Design a protein with these regions (language model features):
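A preference for well-ordered globular domain cores
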Residues: 2-151
Length: 151
């Protein structure tokens, strides 16, 4: 499959493809953007990087679960978790217990952290998850090979 293809020379329409996942039956699933000009290497990189960033953001926001409950990691929630953790550490747990809402609006799960060890377990797993998602995204962006886009 061509990653860069002119699909209409008269209208100067080009398609850029990335994240190609080939299946056993020979077909493939991929992302694609159609442009009204032949993109430069930097445009291709920017397009693909932006998509990888969006995928990482979505995974961070809604891909983490703790004790089998989904945890919504919005920027605000990340800040609240960090603030609660930092305060608990600084006061040697005197600010505990602290309760967070996990799950969904339809099926909320309220989790109360009674001990510093308990809260530390949650917070370190949250941070590790975010770091793992970011690291995977960086690897994908670093692996963009513009030589595969030569038309």
């Amino acid at each position: 499959m061509k990653l860069l293809e002119c699909v209409n020379p008269v209208k100067n329409k080009w398609r850029v493809r990335w994240d190609v996942q080939e299946r056993d039956d020979g077909s493939a699933e991929y992302m694609e953007a159609e442009l009204t000009h032949k993109p430069s290497g930097e445009e291709i990189k920017s397009l693909v990087r932006t998509w990888y960033n969006e995928q990482a953001d979505a995974a961070i926001l809604s891909g983490f679960s703790y004790e089998n409950a989904p945890v919504w990691l919005s920027q605000e929630n990340q800040y609240n978790y960090k603030a609660a953790y930092d305060l608990a550490v600084q006061t040697d747990g005197k600010t505990l217990p602290v309760t967070f809402k996990f799950g969904t609006d339809e099926e909320p799960v309220y989790r109360t952290f009674e001990t510093l060890d308990d809260l530390t377990d949650f917070y370190t797993k949250t941070v590790k998850y975010i770091q793992d998602v970011l690291t995977a995204g960086w690897k994908k962006k670093d692996a963009i090979d513009l030589s595969k886009y030569e038309a």
